[in-house]
Amino acid sequence: MQKQRLLNVGFGNFVVAERVVSIVNPASAPMRRLREEARDQGRLVDATQGRKTRSIIVTDSNHVILSAIQAETIGQRFIQEENS
């Protein structure tokens, strides 16, 4: 059985690292539209714990995950997870 690696997206929330397609900054208009479309279609997972959204994670199942951790920080965690 293959061991699944988990990516910490902040505040005790984890995502299966192999399912992550992209980690992006939420500031642009296309990312805001992506978030709204995901919310309307029931594909949005809010992992911010009530804090400001600082990154958006898109998975291979087309789910959109909001995180209060900077995209750069999650990216570094992703790289560390791949190397371990």
Swiss-Prot record:
Pfam families in the record: RemA-like
**InterPro entries, alphabetized:** RemA-like (IPR007169)
Family label: Belongs to the RemA family.
Q: What is this protein called?
A: Putative regulatory protein Dde_2720
